[in-house]
């Protein structure tokens, strides 16, 4: 968890949640060529541990794993005007949660109150090269649609979550982050969780 300064007129911070890097992909062909048997030895190598084979040969993870893969990164900017500190903190993030209190026609009001417009939030997301922008803290004068449309002219992969929506932060190889409508993620998890011993009753 990495805090960073946010421009809001008073002392304010945002947070970057940064996951540790993951081991590289397991190279099955390399493991086969080295004589690593299927089973716990391969699991240990995938966890980054060296193993010793029955013939005395020691296999280190770098012999069977590809380059390390980055973990996921979610940045919550909180209230504030667009700033370089947010761009730097959000660089390459999977998800940036950024306020969009106003639309661009209220930019002067946004400056007075040290908030952001949807257009500005989208500019931050584009500059930081994030994967998904989630807009929050909308003024009650908006219903969300116009805010999303304004942001998408700058950064197409923008969502405006509603109460009980969830953002499923998937790894890039599994499709990347996605907005899941209220409760759908929990319902899917419940469907997939079959209690032990009930399989034969269905």
Predicted regions and their residues:
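A short, acidic, flexible beta-alpha connecting loop/helix-capping segment that sits on the rim
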Residues: 139-142, 164-166
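Conserved phosphate-binding/catalytic loops in two-lobed NTP-binding clefts
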Residues: 157-164
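Metal-dependent phosphodiesterase/nuclease catalytic metal-binding core
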Residues: 1-135, 142-149, 154, 170-202
């Amino acid at each position: 968890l990495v805090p960073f300064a946010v421009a809001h007129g008073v002392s304010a911070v945002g947070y970057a949640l940064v996951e540790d890097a993951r081991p590289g992909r397991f190279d099955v062909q390399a493991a086969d060529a080295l004589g690593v048997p299927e089973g716990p030895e391969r699991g240990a190598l995938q966890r980054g541990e060296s193993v010793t084979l029955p013939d005395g040969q020691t296999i280190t993870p770098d012999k069977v794993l590809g380059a390390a893969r980055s973990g996921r990164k979610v940045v919550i900017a909180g209230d504030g005007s667009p700033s370089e500190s947010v761009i730097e903190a959000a660089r390459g993030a999977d998800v940036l949660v950024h306020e969009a209190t106003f639309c661009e026609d209220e930019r002067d009001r946004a400056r007075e109150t040290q908030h952001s417009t949807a257009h500005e939030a989208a500019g931050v997301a584009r500059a930081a090269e994030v994967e998904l922008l989630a807009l929050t803290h909308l003024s009650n004068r908006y219903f969300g649609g116009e805010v999303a449309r304004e942001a998408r002219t700058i950064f197409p992969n923008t969502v405006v979550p509603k109460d009980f929506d969830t953002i499923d932060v998937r790894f890039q190889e599994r499709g990347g982050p996605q907005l899941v409508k209220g409760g759908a993620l929990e319902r899917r998890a419940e469907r997939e969780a079959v209690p032990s011993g009930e399989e034969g009753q269905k």
